[in-house]
Amino acid sequence: GQCFLTELILAYDFVGKTNKRWPTKHDTILVYVKDPGSYYFDSATVDREPYMAPGLVTPEKVARGKLPTDVWWHTIVPTSGKEKTGYPTQKPAGILRRIIQASSREGDTVLDFFAGSGTTGAVAHSLGRNAVLIDDNPEAIAVMTRRMPGATLRTAK
């Protein structure tokens, strides 16, 4: 069956310099689910955003805010600080926390086929979820091994 659920666009405020094409200012996260018929989503765990035109909605809606759309504005991971792993495509923990918290329950397992720096696994663990992280890049494996020393590492044969 078709297990693709949605595409999330992570737009950020940092733009690399280029004169040869439109500068890239976003990343894409493709969300797949094991069974679309039993997909779990808890909107109550998602921080709400302010309405862009508050005069067009009721005061109650303004006070509550709205559920974010599939385009999220976020800053990139700072070049220094506790969160930075040194992996070039690392995603901010806050982004993964929003996805994992709303899309899974404690004890569920989260799968990341392009795990990179392992942020998905680190966040999943902090939220009481299990994680299966997959990546074929030796640099990614090294970063994840340093980041999660207690994790079980298996390699494909």
Report the location of each language-model feature.
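Core catalytic lobe of class I
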Residues: 1-154
